[in-house]
Regions:
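Double-stranded beta-helix
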Residues: 106-136
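Conserved short histidine dyad/triad with adjacent acidic residue
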Residues: 28-33, 46-62, 100
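Short, conserved beta-strand element in jelly-roll/cupin
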Residues: 47-51, 61-80, 118-121
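Short, charged/polar surface micro-motifs in flexible loops or helix N-caps
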Residues: 51-55, 75, 84, 99, ...
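Short acidic-glycine-tyrosine-enriched beta hairpin
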Residues: 82-98
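A short, N-terminal "cap"/entry segment at the start of jelly-roll beta-barrel domains
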Residues: 1-42, 127-136
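Short beta-strand His + acidic residue motifs that chelate non-heme Fe in jelly-roll/DSBH
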Residues: 58, 78-79, 95, 102-108
């Protein structure tokens, strides 16, 4: 029996592009942009795999977007406003818009980390501040 079009597995849609930010050699995680692949445009849902030594992004703070992360597997570090906090499977973290709380998730372990990331889909009105990379 064929699966319906609105059912997919994250491994089938993960972007294996090993690039990072333009002009930077740092490699980030691999993301499956689930919402867009399923035709959902009001939600931004992604499954991210962080190999050892990688992070989700530059530390950043959303000015007008909400963001949520749920740890599926592994024990990554939450970097938040310059402090590290160890996370575990089942932990969730939320950032309401406009708080100015800078954050990223880092894999400082020797095994892969898997995250479910939910936010509002990118729109031109959304502004992001990168405190350690203000030129972005």
């Amino acid at each position: 029996m064929t699966r319906p079009d609105n059912v997919l597995h994250w491994k089938d849609v993960t972007d294996l592009d090993d690039s990072g930010y333009p002009g930077d050699d740092e490699r980030l995680g691999f993301t499956a942009k689930l919402s867009s692949k399923l035709g959902l445009f009001r939600l931004g849902i992604g499954h991210e795999v962080l190999p050892p030594g990688r992070r989700t992004s530059y530390p950043h703070a959303e000015l007008s977007e909400e963001e949520f992360v749920f740890v599926l597997e592994g024990t990554p570090d939450l970097w938040q406003d310059g402090h590290l906090h160890r996370l575990a499977p089942g932990d969730s973290v939320g950032w309401p818009s406009g708080t100015g709380v800078a954050h990223t998730i880092i894999n400082n372990t020797d095994t892969d980390v898997r995250l479910l990331i939910v936010g509002e889909p990118s729109r031109r009105r959304f502004k992001v501040h990168y405190p350690l990379h203000p030129e972005r």
